[in-house]
Every structure is written in C-alpha cells, then in structure tokens.
A protein has these predicted regions:
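Conserved N-terminal beta1-alpha1 strand-loop-helix module at the mouth
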Residues: 1-82, 101, 161, 189-204
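N-terminal beta-strand motif that seeds the catalytic metal site of vicinal oxygen chelate
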Residues: 3-17, 203-224, 231-244, 293
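Structural preference for beta-strand elements that scaffold enzyme active sites
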Residues: 11-15, 38-40, 61-65, 84-85, ...
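Glycine-rich beta-to-alpha transition loops that act as phosphate-gripper elements at the mouths
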Residues: 17-19, 66-72, 88-92, 108-113, ...
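Catalytic cores of alpha/beta
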Residues: 27, 71-81, 114-122, 159-174
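Core segments of cupin and vicinal oxygen chelate
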Residues: 27, 44, 209-237, 249-252, ...
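Glycine-rich phosphate-binding active-site loops on the catalytic face of alpha/beta enzymes
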Residues: 89-95, 128-138, 172-194
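Vicinal oxygen chelate
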Residues: 204, 213, 253-293
Length: 293
C-alpha cells in the first residue's frame, strides 16, 4: 500500500500542535485506541521534531506527517526524525523542489488554479486545500478541482464532525485534516481518554456504519426467532449474519481489518470504476456484510 492509498483508507488525519514532546507518545496512543493511527505534527512549536521522533520510535506503523513546514531546514529535520510526509500551508517552490530532490513525499497547500498548476508542474498529484472552510468549503473545492480530474486533495481548516462527510464524498478528496479531536486544552491537561473518545466518535461518523438487516439460521431457538422477527430480522437455513451499510466500503474494510476481522476474498464486489461496493467478513459461524449506502 503506497502513501496515497494509506491516506485514502485512513480518511482523517488529526492535525496536532504539541507544546511538549513529553505528550507525544500518550497522544499517539490515545489516537490509536480511538481508531486513528495517523497524525500531522505541526512545526508551530519547538517540540515538533522531537515529538515526531518519539512517536516514530514507539509506533513504527503510525502514519506521521510533519505540518506547517515552511523551509527546507524543517523538512530535513522532520524526515530525519521519522516523518513520512511533508505538509505545508502554502506552495513554496523552493521547499517543494528541495523535497522532490531529496525524495521526500510533499503536499503543499493551494487555494487557486495557478497554485494547482504550479504543483502539477512539479509532478505532484496530491495537494492540501487550506484553509478549506474559509476559502469556500465544499462548493469551492468542487469548482476548483473540476478541471483537474487526476488531482487529489486533502482539505484542512474548519473541518469537524459536522462537515467531514460532505468533503469525503467528493471524488477529488483523498482524505481530510482536522483538529477537533486533539484540542490543545485536552492535550495540556493530559485528558487523553477524552481524545480517544472524540477520535472514536470521529471514526464512527466517518464510517457511518448502520445495521440494515440481520439473518438467523434454523439453529436459533424458536423464541429468539419470534422476538427477532418482530424487529424485521431475516431467517436463513444457511448462515447467521448481519449486513451494515457504510459511507465507504474500502475504508470500512480497512478499519475492520485493523480490529481483527477476517475478510472473505470471495465476497468482494466492485463497480464499473473498480471501487469496492460490497464486502464480507467471517465472524465464527456468522458472516458480516458491508455495502455502500
């Protein structure tokens, strides 16, 4: 899985400002418990480099981006510390050229067609749309992306649980950046349980899992059948199971695999654009199905 594929299945990258590197590992652990093994650590404080280094050492599989990288020196420091991606609020040609020369994955910020075309002239296929809401939000991004069908965006700025899905539904959006689950006061007070819970809520909202129907086979007790039948549950002589609808099947599959579910490769279905639309997981003698809403 390449970097863009990892970003796509992750869907949401927490944007973090850490005042002290001593909070870095606990924060990453809290995010992971909530379902997100990713973070953009911003170079808005002197703790960024060491924070990246500590997280990379403790959690090697964490998707780590360095944010607010404004110069070549910070790009080098971030990558040496263990970052896997350089992100900046704007497009500084000198920084982009330096990153490309060094082989660093880089995602500069853009707000106009001119900046998009400059990014494309460097051979980039993914950019950051920042500040997303202040620049017109979903409506602006739809218009901005229209002429550039192969370009992907990571909108960041003003995104929260209320508008996240409206961005992720856009075909041009690879993933989103957000900070509402990693608020500064929660980090400063060490309230990592709250960060875990907010992260879990964000992931649940992003996946949008909803039980659509369930099936019980003939081995289930008659009384259980009777009561479950009143709830609209179906019955089958072959298997027990449940079917959930979700916002994005590929993303939901990835998250379920992270939680230990075993996918059934014989039950994958794709649409004409090769996007996963249906999947199934083994759950003992039962089957859990996923389908796109």
């Amino acid at each position: 899985m390449n970097l863009n594929e990892k970003l796509a299945v992750t869907g949401l990258v927490p944007v973090v400002k850490l005042k002290s590197a001593d909070s870095a590992v606990a924060l990453a652990e809290a995010l992971g418990k909530g379902g997100l093994k990713a973070a953009e650590i911003t170079f808005r404080t002197d703790a960024a480099e060491e924070s990246i280094r500590r997280i990379a050492k403790e959690f090697p599989d964490f998707l780590l981006a360095a944010g607010t990288v404004l110069n070549c020196e910070n790009a080098d420091r971030a990558m040496d510390a263990g970052a896997g991606l350089i992100v900046s609020p704007g497009l500084n040609p000198k920084v982009v050229e330096h990153c490309i020369k060094k082989g660093y994955p880089v995602m500069p910020g853009i707000t106009s067609p001119s900046e998009i075309e400059l990014a494309m002239s460097f051979g980039l296929d993914t950019v950051k749309f920042f500040p997303a809401e202040a620049m017109g939000g979903v409506k602006m991004l739809k218009a901005l992306s229209a002429p550039y069908g192969n370009l992907k965006f990571m909108p960041t700025g003003g995104i929260d649980s209320g508008n996240l899905q409206s961005y992720l539904e856009l075909p041009c959006v690879l993933c989103c950046g957000g900070s509402w689950m990693v608020k500064g006061d929660l980090i400063d007070s060490g309230n990592f349980d709250a960060i875990t819970e907010l992260t879990r809520q964000a992931v649940d909202s992003m996946l949008g899992l909803k039980l659509e129907r369930a099936t019980l086979n003939s081995n289930c007790g008659a009384e259980l059948k009777e009561h479950c039948g009143k709830l609209g549950m179906e019955f089958s002589d072959k298997e027990c199971g449940a079917c959930f609808s979700c916002n994005d099947v590929q993303r939901a599959v990835w998250y379920m695999e992270q939680r230990g579910f075993e996918i059934d490769p014989t039950r994958l279905e794709y649409d004409s654009k090769h996007r996963l639309t249906k999947a199934a997981f083994k759950a003992g003698n039962a089957v859990i199905r996923l389908e796109k809403k």
